[in-house]
Amino acid sequence: MKAVVFAYHDIGCTGIEALLEAGYEIQAVFTHADDPSENRFFGSVAQLCAEHGLPVYSPEDVNHPLWVEHIKGLAPQALFSFYYRHMLKQEILDIPSAGAFNLHGSLLPAYRGRAPINWCLVNGEQLTGITLHQMTMRPDAGAIVAQQAVAIKWADTALTLHGKVRLAAKALLDAELPKLRTGDISLTPQDESRASYYGRRTPADGELHWDKSARDLYNLVRAVTQPYPGAFSFAGDRKLTVWKATHIAQDSDMLPGTILSQDPLRIACGEGVLEIVAGQAEGGLYVRGAQLARELGLVAGMRLGAKASSALRKERLTRVLILGVNGFIGNHLTERLLKDGRYEIYGLDISASALGRFIDHPHFHFVEGDISIHTEWIEYHIKKCDVILPLVAIATPIEYTRNPLRVFELDFEENLKIVRYCVKYNKRIIFPSTSEVYGMCDDHSFDEDESRLIVGPIHKQRWIYSVSKQLLDRVIWAYGKKEGLNFTLFRPFNWMGPRLDSLDSARIGSSRAITQLILNLVDGTPIQLVDGGAQKRCFTDIEDGIEALFRIIENKGNRCDGQIINIGSPDNEASILQMAEVLLGKFEAHPLRHHFPPFAGFKRVESKSFYGDGYQDVSHRRPSIKNARRLLDWEPTIEMEETIGKTLDFFLQGAVSTGVEHD
């Protein structure tokens, strides 16, 4: 059987050797060039291929059309991925006649994503393993071919566990590869209810937080000890790395991080005591814990913790400037940031109608104003704040055709000024792009880094919003590349929930779909389905969306710098008609139903009569959320039906309280 292989690491070498032993004809191997900054403790796929005379490549973009055509020309019957670090596009996965298969270092569906061996140890698991599964565009989500379990012992480190998993991988492949050749395999779909996903780890994730239990800290030490960067802490500003430790079930009345003794070097934790068996001062040697204590002058009563200079800096709250703070996203984001307690919010908007619950908060500062007028205030606060979120935009479809020039002036020209202030004062900008930039993209799911951005002809003015946002995306990207602007672009996919628009805005047609439909129910007018409501969207609960946006602001390990991130819920895909039917069902069952007129039915209308000349719609808009999973460790959790119920309840409560009801 002919095979193309994507491989890296020891597991990659193991996979190639297993294929050769099973009689597969390997036509090409794709791997990664070694990263000089990485401590490479594993075998070289490139070297192994050279020894076996296999053609090996390391393209910068294996999904480039030239490489796709090259792989098609090889006509492989099977494709294998063994610890290859890049996602493969569907176009490549569709090439092999017998399928594409990946080897993942966990017992799926648990521990999808990056660094599963390290994460298993961090979480104190007692069992992991290796899984051979079909490849899909969703990472590690395809049907399972076979699994082999590996027991985790208390003394295991990431290195020893990796060795066990490698041996399990060899045994699994030896058993399954002959079956794959003959087609004698059975596939088991993954149980999504048991799925978990973990993102990449960075050296910063190794910091020891002494308020945790000694058991948890021991697990962290063994998860990141050599050859990984190691767990670490600080004595003042002096860094020490803990390479080996043990935990002691001993109570202590000392504050977490307090040194209890020098020899042995023992530290009080939130629960129990951690003994540092071996460690290393920055620039020093690997030594026993007692010697490390002497070298750093550590004595009983001193405390370890965060770097002293960093801790002092962290005492100041992070200042966040939100322009458009009264809007749907700005309002919910303010609530989330203030709840966290580490942020001070400066907000500007033309109204404070939804801000009453924040006005008296000591960390919330609001000015009523227009971004096109209050330019001096904006420039001063951009200079003053740490993170800038310009959320002001016209984002309702009817305005794209009704007021295209106003859309351009506000959404592009005014926001470009803000971008340039951020460049001038070297400030981090988190810019709200939009799912609209993908336009009529024909991909199954829209990928931030790969999908084409396709819009209609010039006379279709509805695209002025999309291209205004897209051009700003490109300008921000260019400023990042050429002038060092620190940015993140996020693209919301049909976020909805309480406070989305208002019934008054819906009355003049200037609202999003669900608000318009709720108005029809409240007023007793027919629900208007533009072009029959067949258009599909992926509806995302505002709570899920805000949690992802909060993590972008938090930016652990600076992972979000220079990134584009879709934020949406692919599993909540439904047509506008389906959404309307769910909404109607919840409306009829609502305790306030008797306040409103009878349901007036559905009415199909043409888009031209509803939106006017220049409108053009798209059939589907489904996000790839691989970047959100990888960078934010985020997954949407709330189903569309729940979101519709919350949104409906908010507007019905408001309508009854203001007297907008049926007599």
Curated annotation (Swiss-Prot):
Q: Which segments does the entry list as coiled coil?
A: none
- Cellular component terms per the entry's GO annotation: membrane
The GO terms describing molecular function are:
carboxy-lyase activity; UDP-4-amino-4-deoxy-L-arabinose formyltransferase activity; UDP-glucuronate dehydrogenase activity
Site annotation Raises pKa of active site His: residues: 140
Binding positions for (6R)-10-formyltetrahydrofolate per the UniProt entry: 114, 136-140
Task: Tell me which residues this entry annotates as catalytic.
Answer: 104, 436, 621
Query: Region (Dehydrogenase ArnADH): which ranges?
Result: 316-663
What pathway is it annotated to?
Nucleotide-sugar biosynthesis; UDP-4-deoxy-4-formamido-beta-L-arabinose biosynthesis; UDP-4-deoxy-4-formamido-beta-L-arabinose from UDP-alpha-D-glucuronate: step 1/3; Nucleotide-sugar biosynthesis; UDP-4-deoxy-4-formamido-beta-L-arabinose biosynthesis; UDP-4-deoxy-4-formamido-beta-L-arabinose from UDP-alpha-D-glucuronate: step 3/3; Bacterial outer membrane biogenesis; lipopolysaccharide biosynthesis
Q: Which reaction does it catalyse?
A: UDP-alpha-D-glucuronate + NAD(+) = UDP-beta-L-threo-pentopyranos-4-ulose + CO2 + NADH; UDP-4-amino-4-deoxy-beta-L-arabinose + (6R)-10-formyltetrahydrofolate = UDP-4-deoxy-4-formamido-beta-L-arabinose + (6S)-5,6,7,8-tetrahydrofolate + H(+)
- Entry EC no(s): 2.1.2.13, 1.1.1.305
* Annotated function: Bifunctional enzyme that catalyzes the oxidative decarboxylation of UDP-glucuronic acid (UDP-GlcUA) to UDP-4-keto-arabinose (UDP-Ara4O) and the addition of a formyl group to UDP-4-amino-4-deoxy-L-arabinose (UDP-L-Ara4N) to form UDP-L-4-formamido-arabinose (UDP-L-Ara4FN). The modified arabinose is attached to lipid A and is required for resistance to polymyxin and cationic antimicrobial peptides.
Q: What PANTHER family does this protein's entry cite?
A: BIFUNCTIONAL POLYMYXIN RESISTANCE PROTEIN ARNA, UDP-D-APIOSE_UDP-D-XYLOSE SYNTHASE 2
Q: Which protein are we looking at?
A: Bifunctional polymyxin resistance protein ArnA
Which organism's genome codes for this protein?
Aeromonas salmonicida (strain A449)
Instruction: List the taxonomic lineage.
Output: Bacteria, Pseudomonadati, Pseudomonadota, Gammaproteobacteria, Aeromonadales
